[in-house]
Amino acid sequence: MQSTESFHALPTRSDVEDPNERRKIQNRIAQKKHRQKMKRRIEELETKVNNQCQTSNWTSHAPTDSCQEQQFLDNTDFGLMLEDDLLYRELSASLDGAGLTAVAQMHDSPRPNQQQRLSVSGMPSSPTSTSNVAQRGLSIGDHSSASNHLSSLSLVPGSTEGSLPTRQHDNLCNQDLRDMVPEEKMSRILKVIQDAGYKDMDSFMTEYYVRDFDASSHVSAVQRQSRSRRLRGFLEQLRVGAESWSDYEAHDYQQEISKSAEAIYAKELDVFSTTTLGENASFQGLASLYRVLQSTVGSDIENHLRHEQSMMQRQVSEIVHRQVYTFNPAQC
């Protein structure tokens, strides 16, 4: 164990500017607090078990009842010991996942009072309790068999029994999904979506992109990222993939994309006409609009405007020709 002098010689977070060193110091502080918390927890459990054991010895004189009470206390203490060990492993895993690598050292070094927790306050284990532990496939020094037995215990005191097996089952299901072929994976996802109350994948995606979620929720933050960053790539992949679809499959998609483009184009022209052009729009205003759109959109708009300009000139020529023919048919 580290001496008091060497501990006080360690620098504090305020004395270090390197982020890695600051994380190491923060890790050491978290380890110290966790060890203190676990030590207090162990002392409370040992005191509680001692009191219960003494009370049972004073009030019960029958040998059979004493053995059953002692077996219950041993099993209770053993279960609480494993629950505390699970808490310790959960905290270590969470700190290690956050980049605090020094937590891994705690797994290698023995923690205080680890052996004492296997017995009740130093009392010799009864044959009943020893055989019970052996039936469970556990021993004092066998950590591998103990870790296998953790699946039958709850993670924290007061939690529902079987929460850890549920987590392991979820991990296995996720691994199975990753190993599936695309057809089976999509079938599983579609079934989950339908079980959640959605008619199909399209209704699910529509609600994801259109629905107004609570601004403080996690799904709202993910939705904003999808709208602002990932939707463009999604539409691009959809446009490229639609080229290989049949005409029947691509018809509705192309029609809706055309409507969207027309709506966006009309809105932009309306905004431009109200802010730049006056009521008497002329060819100069049209030329100005042409230059703006050419610089912002590109050659597609240029070709479109040329076509519109030629159509307008043709209509003007037809109107002029009609008027000349009306007033002087002989010249025509």
Swiss-Prot record:
GO process terms (BP): zearalenone biosynthetic process
Primary localization: nucleus
Recorded GO CC terms: nucleus
Cellular compartments annotated: Nucleus
Chain residue ranges for the region called Disordered: 1-37, 106-170
Alphabetical UniProt keywords: Nucleus, Transcription, Transcription regulation
Family: Belongs to the bZIP family.
Name this polypeptide is given: Transcription factor ZEB2
Source species of the chain: Gibberella zeae (strain ATCC MYA-4620 / CBS 123657 / FGSC 9075 / NRRL 31084 / PH-1) (Wheat head blight fungus)
Lineage: Eukaryota, Fungi, Dikarya, Ascomycota, Pezizomycotina
